């Protein structure tokens, strides 16, 4: 089974945003990915963009089972049908996730703390990306 840890964030909310993704199998990291996604991005949009990229990357490694691990309670609950998707931009991203799910036999979503080992690594990737784009952190590493 493939596991993904994805994280999206912005500095300012909205503000400059980036995503970070870890793709793993049997405890081994297969891929690390980060990308700057725009100047005026909300945290929720960044979280969805990160999940979309995580699903795209996972589909390179498997068409079978994938577990997507996120620290965004909102995204998880929307995907599980516990929260409605009201915002038009989030709805568009939600529908993209739904379409990407068709690439897999089984998909599972798991909410974890931002302090989870691999979640922290995904967070570091996105924050390093923002640093590299010239958007310095409000706090020291």
Name every feature range the model reports, one short phrase each:
Residues 1-45, 56-60:
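RNase H-like nuclease fold core
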Residues 5, 9-13, 52-125, 134-137:
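RNase H catalytic domain
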Residues 46-50:
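Loop-to-helix element that buttresses phosphate recognition and phosphoryl-transfer chemistry
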Residues 128-130:
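Active-site proximal helix-loop segment of RNase H-like, two-metal nucleases, encompassing DDE(D)
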Residues 139-141:
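Short acidic DE-rich linear segments
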């Amino acid at each position: 089974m493939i596991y993904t840890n994805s994280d999206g964030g912005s500095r300012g909310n909205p503000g400059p945003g980036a995503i970070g993704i870890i793709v793993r199998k049997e405890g081994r990291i297969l891929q690390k990915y980060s990308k700057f996604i725009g100047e005026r991005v909300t945290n929720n949009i960044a979280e969805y963009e990160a999940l979309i990229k995580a699903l795209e990357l996972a589909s390179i490694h498997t068409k079978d089972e994938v577990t997507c691990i996120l620290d965004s309670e909102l995204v998880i609950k929307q995907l599980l049908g516990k929260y409605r998707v009201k915002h038009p931009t989030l709805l568009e991203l939600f529908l993209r996730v739904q379409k990407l799910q068709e690439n897999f036999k089984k998909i599972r979503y798991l909410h974890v703390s931002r302090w989870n080992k691999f979640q922290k690594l995904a967070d570091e990737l996105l924050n390093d990306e923002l640093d590299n784009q010239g958007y310095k952190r409000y706090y020291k590493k």
